[in-house]
């Protein structure tokens, strides 16, 4: 048998094997044909309209031949999908059976799960019925997705099958239906575009799981909020087919799909225009009617309504970019100018030494290069400045051994020095000193040998010590100086011996020694002598030039007669755009934008026209495609066009993230930038960049180009537990060594006071530009079109430009350079906000120059990171090994939760304010730099103050020799005074330069006191800090006494360094005259202290300590007035914008000067209007946003479940967003679920949502209006109106639509009137005296009914009303009880209901005991209505003049004080009330003799019943110490 017949035979056998099902199917087809050809049309027959044949009818032999031909051509029919198993073998599958397929890429089609199979199209062949079933829903999909897509051709009536029941059970999303149909055809360009979109949707993570619903033809509701979600997942509703063949179409003027180049970050804004969502509903005629359904009860700003008068940041950048002026051209030449200089170029030498301008320095603390310091800066070569690295080798440790007193006896030393002519420089003296120290040297040598130190040198030197270690002698003495290389191990800090007490300097870094010993103070010109240029093959850096010196003594500060030019620097602003990999919950980079500014001045500010001029800027962006996808059509051509137009590569397209990172590093290396700039670049961009380089296995010769040191191993990038402000982690700073890091996020927090420090907020408030926010979830859908991706490029470059512009706007580089030059630390540390290190280095330079041994800096220890501080700040005799281990390299305190302590000594004096509204002029006078002035005034210094052994505050120094601190401060003050004199005559940029210099001097001087009182400071000295604050309190009190007693003026408030004087005058000139008189009287008492007029207030509202608002008048005589707020809720960021606006309105009304009635009426009507707008959904969503800062990482909060901002941060972090670290500001809104039975289900923290969550799910959440009215608006307004007559918290609550009864607080003005000061004896009216007391509640012995027992005095009151003549007819229950002594509900004949004397006494005692227990529970509650923190624990923190135990634990978020909920006075009043209830004798005694007679007999009989109870409760009350006065405390024994 030949091959063809064999195949035919096999086919025949297979066809016969198809069995009864195939035969039945053939029979059914025959009946169908008969019906179609005009056969009997019975009523029961199925009516099927067939416009074209479904199957071909062929003979069995023809079918076998067809199968054989298919099998033969199977290989050419379809490609085997790279071996994934999808191929056609020519067989026809039985569609009535389910089959298992190896391909997971193709889903099932229809309810029977048949595979989608590709066939060669033939004119006579028809699509299987299953495709018709899928097409039944296609009309809805076409309506939803738009008719311009390829799938719209499938919506014709040919593919609709009436009466199908399958459509009801199908659960295919519209996108899947369209893709399934398209997959049946050969791929074309549109198909590829659709598959790219599908991949983009797969890469875009969904905010919430979207269930696929059925599509219902009679009611197609397209939720545009869902349709425009950033994840682009489509949610459709059910469609059911009916007998009528209904056409579904949308009105042509309704656009249901956003344009591809529309930024999808604006999805919620598009969807929620005018506070509504558009829902299309289909009517009977087949048309879809658009209805608006209100979802979110707040308005969401659209792009058009948002800051119409504010310039677009993107448009601003495009204008700067221009037509290529700043893209290539001179900027590109400047970037590549290094190419014309090679290593053979000669340096510009001066006197044989290399002038080198230092910018940064770095050392490797461990490893083979330990002790090697790398200096990075600029050198001049060929009339241009280029980068250079100076490698300083052979650094030596410098350790001081403090000998015992027997080594260098004082009398022996005195005799030797007297005999010596030139002190310790005399050879004979040095020989004698070596001889005296021979035993010490021998012991030290043995110790060094034990630690494998073989090469060392020792010499006796004279040094001073004046710091806090009590085990070391103060004053000048001889010590043993030890030098040995850094490559050898460090000696232990606690090493001691027979001949020495301690070793100091064991852990000092090589970099610190180099800066201090060589007197290098920040960016400056150095002279490098005896250097050796390194060839390119041996270099350890990426700098253009590199030299090596073998000794640090070859480096010195360059001293020239002429001032050398300060070299400009190259600044590169970097911005990354990332997407979130939900599987691993990490950020992946999709684009990186860099804007480079060449020749940036660092010695003076730069105007925008200077740094934006032609040739100053260059830019480029690197973008990669998403994994498994391709770039949109046309993007490659657009990239080429842009590059050609710019003359350089401004847009590079890469195939993978690894290629993107390589390209970025290469471009950064070409720029050779000195400064990296970015917004939150420390906390996000660099961290993501380096982690992705690590994950993508970018080679070390590439990723190390982010810095200037060549590296082979990436350092650890973990941030650890450092508090915010320390900037980037040590690992990141190690990677970028050689380049300065300017984070505008950190700088803005230091220099500005803003609600939020996001780039969007700062661009709006500081730069007056509107920034487009693009979240990681918005980016994947943008890969659908080239236009959207080009927008993404613009957004990335715009963000980089905004960070650059913010840096220039704040003059960050000139200001931080001045601070660094004053302090003498590293510029990079100053840029990272290391304020403590600035003061530390300032003192290190000062004390080293005076031959002092400085205190050791204790490094952090891992094993002690989470433990409490070992050194008790109250103990002066703390040993050095008990120092706080939580000091990091920058001197920042590690947040350790509850172990964190406040100051352990009293702070500044804060006087009790005279609260109220003042409508006459109020003067504010304050001392200029009080604490630095006190240091100078009283010569307070480490070297002059004698510390007391008992730990008490030391006395003022008697020494006339000026100490180091006063001398240092004096020089700073004189320099600032000189600069300010220059400032008066300067103009333009020179004026700005002087202003920056005087600001830097002021900041440095004012930071001096902080290092003394900060327990983690290297120069911490609690006795000095205590002495300074004590003098500050005395000075303020003396000033108040002088003003009140000598000048007869009223001081209404005082705080630390300032006082407020109420003049009682309406004439501002006379008020100024009073101020001048006060200044004259105060200043003549002091030498360095100086008080000055700081403000004149026309009207003031003084609420409480540190909280006031006033209208401030300009001091220059102009009529300018502005409202100044201190400590009010409106200036705190943890209140919503809505509450701040209402608070400002109320404040303006109160300070307006209008009548009290008009002010109250205006406030009440405004509150009514506001609550109506809020409940009506007319308030903008942005006004509900509350912002709070994270003080630690969100996962480190022990009470995270109760903190709204922490819950939001945890949710954001889980979804991969940035901005969730310690120090970040988190915005949130308190919401309630729309579909929840209870609108307040869950706590406040559980109902807090990020604003973007509301915009993405407007149909799920709604604003909790009641929360904002009761917790945000009411507390603010009630506190402002507390001193205004005519309103109350209950009345304000009523205006806000709240339950006024909830605001009838028992704790009424505890600040104004202490309940303990109210004497019960002076209040004659019992109702007033015992107002608020709980009644005596008795329980019936028979029926157990509880009822209130009236006072026995009710008998007299009731009888006076006419009930005494016939008591049995009296209707007063009070009178009936005392006469019946029975339960009011029980009949008189029931003896069991009688309240016996024992029952009355026992029940009264039990209730008295319950109130005593309530008192001893000691419940404390914060008096701040916005806080209401309650606790049973006592907080022993001391702040200012507040009593110990009264500081709210929520400080500094809350400035309230803890007050007892149930005080001694409350308990005594309650017990007194119980006595009053049963004291019949006292009631009779209060009556006149004539009025007493009718009641004596009745009361005498009643006394037998109540005397037992009275005696019991009186005994309890008399034990209460509150009711007694101790005379011994009032009198003095003689």
From Swiss-Prot:
- Motif range (CysB motif): 1422-1451
Residues annotated as binding Zn(2+) 1 are: 1340, 1343, 1383, 1386
Q: Where is the composition biased (Low complexity)?
A: 1-12, 127-141
One GO term in the molecular function aspect is: DNA-directed RNA polymerase activity
Give the EC number(s) under which this enzyme is classified: 2.7.7.7
For bias kind Basic residues, which ranges apply?
116-125
Protein residues bound to Zn(2+) 2: 1422, 1427, 1448, 1454
Query: Its GO biological process terms?
Result: DNA replication initiation; lagging strand elongation; leading strand elongation; leaf morphogenesis; mitotic DNA replication initiation
Nucleotidyltransferase among the record's keywords? Answer: yes
Region (Disordered) residue ranges read: 1-23, 96-141, 864-905
Q: Where are the zinc fingers (CysA-type)?
A: 1340-1386
Q: Which superkingdom does the taxonomy of this entry point to?
A: Eukaryota
Q: Does the keyword Transmembrane apply?
A: no
**What GO CC annotations are associated with the protein?**
alpha DNA polymerase:primase complex; nucleus
Q: Which reaction does it catalyse?
A: DNA(n) + a 2'-deoxyribonucleoside 5'-triphosphate = DNA(n+1) + diphosphate
Q: Where are the compositionally biased (Basic and acidic residues) regions?
A: 864-882, 889-898
Q: Where in the cell is it found?
A: Nucleus
Family matches, as InterPro entries: DNA-dir_DNA_pol_B, DNA-dir_DNA_pol_B_CS, DNA-dir_DNA_pol_B_exonuc, DNA-dir_DNA_pol_B_multi_dom, DNA/RNA_pol_sf, DNA_pol_a_cat_su_N, DNA_pol_B_thumb, DNA_pol_palm_dom_sf
Purpose of the protein:
Polymerase alpha in a complex with DNA primase is a replicative polymerase.
Miscellaneous? In eukaryotes there are five DNA polymerases: alpha, beta, gamma, delta, and epsilon which are responsible for different reactions of DNA synthesis.
Q: Which family does it belong to?
A: Belongs to the DNA polymerase type-B family.
Designated name of the protein: DNA polymerase alpha catalytic subunit
Query: Which species expresses this protein natively?
Result: Oryza sativa subsp. japonica
